[in-house]
Regions:
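Classical Sec-dependent N-terminal signal peptides that target proteins to the secretory pathway
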Residues: 2-21
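Glycine/tyrosine- and acidic-biased, solvent-exposed loop/turn segments at the edges of beta-strands
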Residues: 18-184
Length: 184
């Protein structure tokens, strides 16, 4: 009887033998990438046909940037003055105009609006010194899709085009209004 009880207990314990649960002490360390963020001055110039950012430069020849810097490139809010006098104030991403900003050319053309990877892209307003004004969408730097162009001074002063654009030109449906009220 005792032998049978012993065998019975062994049979009950049998499923638990050989089933060993091993929990290893594993330490998981997060990978932390340290980004160098700062505010400062950078200079952009062409080297072997490619634009590059440098900490030292010549203000008379290079483009000068003042603002937020991340990993050696403009990133965040800043201002760049180009060698020809053109100026951009706004957001940057990875060294390019990206987001909301204002671009003013040496001829005093002024664009206020969205930029995407360095180009006018999205909703914006372009004004010229003679009073011409375009309000609408841009695609890769050109007037595109829908916009309103109002002529300022000069021969066409007071005239307006409301309609579609493609690649910077009137294209598709639109209405042209002369200063005397005639429409086409």
């Amino acid at each position: 009887m005792k032998k049978q009880q012993f065998v019975f207990i062994l049979l009950l314990l049998l499923p638990f033998t050989g089933c060993k649960s091993v929990v290893k002490d594993t330490v998981v360390e997060p990978v932390v990438q340290v980004e160098k963020r700062q505010t400062g001055v950078l200079f952009e110039r062409k080297v072997n046909g490619k634009w590059e950012w440098h900490e030292v430069g010549d203000e008379t020849k290079d483009h000068k940037y003042v603002g937020k810097i991340e990993n050696g490139k403009p990133h965040g809010r800043g201002k760049i003055t180009f060698a020809d006098g053109e100026q951009y104030v706004g957001k940057f991403k990875d060294g390019q105009k990206h987001g909301q900003g204002t671009l003013t050319t040496p001829d005093r053309d002024r664009y206020v609006g969205k930029f995407w990877h360095g180009e006018k892209h999205g909703q914006g307003t372009l004004t010229t010194p003679n009073g011409d004004k375009y309000v609408g969408r841009f695609y890769h730097g050109k007037k595109h899709v829908q916009g309103i162009y109002t002529f300022g001074k000069g021969e066409w002063g007071g005239q307006k085009y409301v309609g579609e654009y493609k690649d910077g030109k009137y294209h598709g449906r639109g209405t042209y209004t002369w200063s005397d009220g005639r429409k086409y």
